[in-house]
UniProtKB/Swiss-Prot annotation:
SMART domains: S4. The lineage of its organism: Bacteria, Pseudomonadati, Pseudomonadota, Gammaproteobacteria, Pasteurellales. NCBIfam families: PRK10700.1, pseudouridine synthase. Its EC number is 5.4.99.22. This is Ribosomal large subunit pseudouridine synthase B. It comes from Haemophilus influenzae (strain ATCC 51907 / DSM 11121 / KW20 / Rd). Residues 1-12, 41-54 have a biased composition (Polar residues). It catalyses: uridine(2605) in 23S rRNA = pseudouridine(2605) in 23S rRNA. The active site is at 183 (nucleophile). Residues 1-76 are annotated as: Disordered. GO terms for biological process: enzyme-directed rRNA pseudouridine synthesis.
Length: 357
């Protein structure tokens, strides 16, 4: 039998494995196409929604305005003006402001307030109006005072004990500001000034103004102990040390030393020695910067410093020189002798005792 003219073409034979591979590759192609399409569609919708709804787009960052571009507050800091007016050091006045004792135009002042002294603004401390008219022309005055033991470095004492301000000359329109403090059992040089800014700078640790003390200690002192005190000892308020220690005399376990500090922390000299088991039995401040306790000045006596020494202190802390003084040159040349000062101090002490009785 002859084969028919039309012969069916033979279909190629595929194995099951090859079919699976073919189907898998096709499926992957479809998936890749569909994934690309979905991403393009999503992006199109997102851009369309964002163009219609502005709240979905992230706001642009505002340009940073630097402090230098902002207008500065007019006037000077309140504590600086009041310090120059002789109402205390800047730190003392900052404490007053924080306690709500200072008001400006009837409103309680806050730290950072500024005032213009030429605007006639009314400033009160504890309800009393402060005269600011003389703050620009106040002459810087400095007193050297020999503080005796038993006096407090405060303006008033509720127990009625003597204070270092009791014997100072009276002032009108300003007041004396103590440059630092000495505890009740410490005697020696204490400076007072009418310039609050000068007092603040002289006291600030960053100025590193030297304070020298003559100290009598009770106990056995050795070289290792002195080396530790020079290097530094950890106290409860931080590391402290003596810049210089010089032996000046003594017998046995009672010895005298001159020690120098670069700051004035509370009872720092005593605490440094006590950290080594040594007791301080006598402490006298003999120098502040280059200002030495004047020989012949009795305990409880004071001496106003001349313009040269005032300007030394001002230059020491970066303040402009003073050009005026209230110290009478002729009167200064006729200064009373130490014996006269001692008699005056003794009379004052006797009168004070009778008054308290």
């Amino acid at each position: 039998m002859k084969p028919s003219q039309k012969q069916t073409q033979r279909q190629p034979h595929f194995s099951k494995d090859s079919a699976k591979k073919r189907d898998f590759s096709a499926k992957n192609d479809r998936r890749s196409v569909s994934r690309t399409a979905r991403i393009e569609t999503a992006n199109t919708k997102k851009s369309a929604v964002n163009s219609d709804n502005k709240f979905l787009s992230k706001p642009k960052a505002k340009p940073v305005v630097r402090a230098s571009n902002q207008p500065k507050a007019e006037g000077e800091k309140l504590q600086k003006v009041l310090a120059r007016a002789g109402q205390g050091s800047r730190r003392e006045i900052e404490t007053m402001i924080a306690a709500g004792r200072v008001s400006v135009e009837g409103k309680i002042a806050t730290l950072g307030d500024r005032i213009d002294v030429h605007s006639g603004v009314k400033v009160r401390i504890d309800g009393q109006i402060i005269n600011l008219s003389h703050t620009q022309k106040e002459i810087c005055r400095v007193l050297m005072y020999y503080k005796p033991e038993g006096e407090l470095c405060t303006r008033s004492d509720p127990e009625g004990r003597a204070t270092v301000f009791d014997r100072l000359p009276r002032l009108t329109g300003s007041r004396w500001i103590a440059v630092g403090r000495l505890d009740i059992n410490t005697s020696g040089l204490l400076l007072f000034t009418t310039d609050g800014e000068l007092a603040n700078r002289l006291m600030h640790p960053s100025r590193e103004v030297e304070r020298e003390y003559s100290v009598r200690v009770f106990g056995q002192v050795d070289d290792a102990m002195l080396a530790r005190l020079r290097k530094g000892v950890q106290l409860e308020d931080g590391l402290a040390n003596f810049k210089e220690i010089k032996f000046t005399g003594g017998v046995g376990i009672n010895q005298w030393y001159d020690v120098t500090l670069m700051e004035g922390r509370n009872r720092e000299v005593r605490r440094l020695w006590e950290s080594q088991g040594i007791q301080v039995s006598r402490l006298i401040r003999i120098r502040y910067g280059n200002i030495k306790l004047m020989k012949g000045l009795p305990r409880g006596g004071w001496e106003e410093m001349d313009l040269e020494n005032v300007n030394y202190l001002r230059e020491l802390v970066g303040l402009p020189a003073e050009t005026e003084t209230k110290l009478d040159v002729k009167q200064a040349s006729r200064r009373p002798k130490s014996g006269q000062i001692r008699k005056a101090v003794k009379r004052y002490s006797e009168m004070n005792k009778r008054y308290k009785k």
